[in-house]
């Protein structure tokens, strides 16, 4: 009997496979990092072949370490870094170029041009997104214009576009032999190419980027009536298992946090931070710099929408302290170092490495460390880095409250940085509300498992999922309103220093 569901979480810095039981408890996992390719200033790439090799390895290893086989799995769910753009040949299976990662800013001039001639307003209305380097449409246009042979092959139906979910599912289902080219509504809603009302590729939006429709995958529900496809005997699982769930990573975290009612919200702390608010079946367009996006679609039901505040650089700022500055040797050391000081010593770090996302959407911004004096140490910079994560989240919370008219009383959190207890305390202090972490912090992988399990009847309904959610830790504010306001004012001043950092 199949008593487990597997989940593939293809993230920005690593790929992991996790296996869950009926209670939503992790019974096994394996995780591998992949290389971050930085060929030029502002460019961020991944090797698609390396991503697929990592996916194969973590899936196979997760089964081996748990002593399970394909027959023990009821379904597989996939979740992924959104917006990251891949193009490959359907006959050879080879990518035409490296994947252009969501953080990449090479398309800044494409994005700026969309706003100058009025196309940006149409994109906002139809796709719910502002023209920005973040989203897939401009990245795909760049590949079509700059990589030899792609446009010709795309027009002939030989070149396939996809976000990482499409690439992983295509390979899992047989690749050049029998690969299924598909995506779900949540990933498609991050491209600037899908109409939020029709849930289909929009011809007018495609024309803005000169994208041939035939290279795009069909769009399906996140938890479809029929599986996307099946793994193969020759694949990493060694047998046929239905692939029955597909969600962009932040939408998967919403499902994993069981934020299934309008008004429920979560904040995921990963490479970036992503705060989503469930708005139900209502399409809510933001007046405060947030995105309108598909939250999920289960079966034949209507889609559920969300408002999202996307922050480009949070966890990757800690990674920068490790990899570029060398002041820590591991991410966990950021907490120990930051605890050596009581405050930031007047230092603010605005990590606008990819410009500023919500609520500013300023691709001209660049990172800055301000307020330095000879008094300051590495510990102050580590503290300022953790504060930057939390101040950026506060800006998004304020925008969300303004759009929804609802005061946030509790913030559900998940993701790797929630292991940093000091960072979570700073978050409670900067917001002035309780911050709550569930027992299963890896809610992205859990959400993909839930979507797949619901599709095949492994879990009956949303109530089954709610029964699985349990609180693990809670942080409450420990500072005065006056001190909270003073710190935030310093942050806002620092942000202004980052603007107009480059010409676009």
Swiss-Prot record:
Regulation: Inhibited by fructose 1,6-bisphosphate (FBP).
Enzyme class per UniProt: transferase
Annotated transmembrane regions: none
Residues in the signal sequence: none
Residues that, per the record, bind ADP: 12, 16, 271, 315, 416, 420
Reactions performed catalytically: glycerol + ATP = sn-glycerol 3-phosphate + ADP + H(+)
Pathway(s) served: Polyol metabolism; glycerol degradation via glycerol kinase pathway; sn-glycerol 3-phosphate from glycerol: step 1/1
Binding site for ATP: 12-14, 271, 315, 319, 416
GO molecular function: ATP binding; glycerol kinase activity
Keyword Transferase listed: yes
Residue pairs linked by disulfide bridges in the UniProt entry: none
Keyword Transferase: yes
Stored Pfam families: FGGY_C, FGGY_N
One GO cellular component, as annotated: cytosol
Annotated EC: 2.7.1.30
Swiss-Prot/TrEMBL keywords: ATP-binding, Glycerol metabolism, Kinase, Nucleotide-binding, Transferase
Binding site for sn-glycerol 3-phosphate: 12, 82-83, 134, 249
Family under the similarity heading: Belongs to the FGGY kinase family.
Task of the protein: Key enzyme in the regulation of glycerol uptake and metabolism. Catalyzes the phosphorylation of glycerol to yield sn-glycerol 3-phosphate.
Name of the featured protein: Glycerol kinase
Organism per entry: Mycobacteroides abscessus (strain ATCC 19977 / DSM 44196 / CCUG 20993 / CIP 104536 / JCM 13569 / NCTC 13031 / TMC 1543 / L948)
